[in-house]
Amino acid sequence: FGGGLVDAETVNAHQIGGNITNYTSQQQQKPGLVKTILILAANPKTTSRLRLDEEVREIDAGLQRAKKREQFDLKQRWAVRVQDVYQSLLDFKPQVVHFSGHGSGDGGLELEDETGKMQLVSTEALARLFELFASNIECVVLNACYSEVQAMAIALHIPYVIGMNKAIGDKAAIKFATGFYSALCAGESVEFAYKLGCNVIQLDGIPESLTPVLKKKL
């Protein structure tokens, strides 16, 4: 879809892995409000099994330990279908949206249909959806393989979007989420939380710390 991606500036996250891409825009700040983190999990029965329950459990545990946990409200939706995504965005008006599941690169993200089988949602459709909710959402995390394509598109509308530039293993995905949300719920910035998430992968000896990528609008 149209323009805005070619002038991105990529800055490497020194010593801790990861890379950050900047786009031009303005971030909306909403200080003093309780932030809602919405987790959308999908693992269609026709796809390989993921450890989504462990990932969400670690996110929740990090939130409970956090110094500023009272500033965050965690909402979860499982086996998500297309209608579950937009309905959850309408119902909860989250500031952070976290997708856990499978990605298909240029094909899109893999949600579930009415029978639990895989339904692909295109990059363009996702970008347009998040554009509609851009006034509330500050950060989107796509913890799915090959989701950098979607992250680039969504980052035209959302201040911070994290995707994966290749396949990512379950353990690395869980470690990244653990570090990211531990930092975020301690009051750190999204960029710091991203860097810590990458570093936690590295600290655990997993050679995938460069897989998560952060796309930014400034």
Spell out what each predicted region is:
Residues V85, L89, L126-F130, F180, ...:
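Generic hydrophobic alpha-helical segments
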Residues F1-T36:
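Long, low-complexity intrinsically disordered regions enriched in small/polar
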Residues E112-C145:
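Caspase-like (clan CD) cysteine peptidase catalytic core
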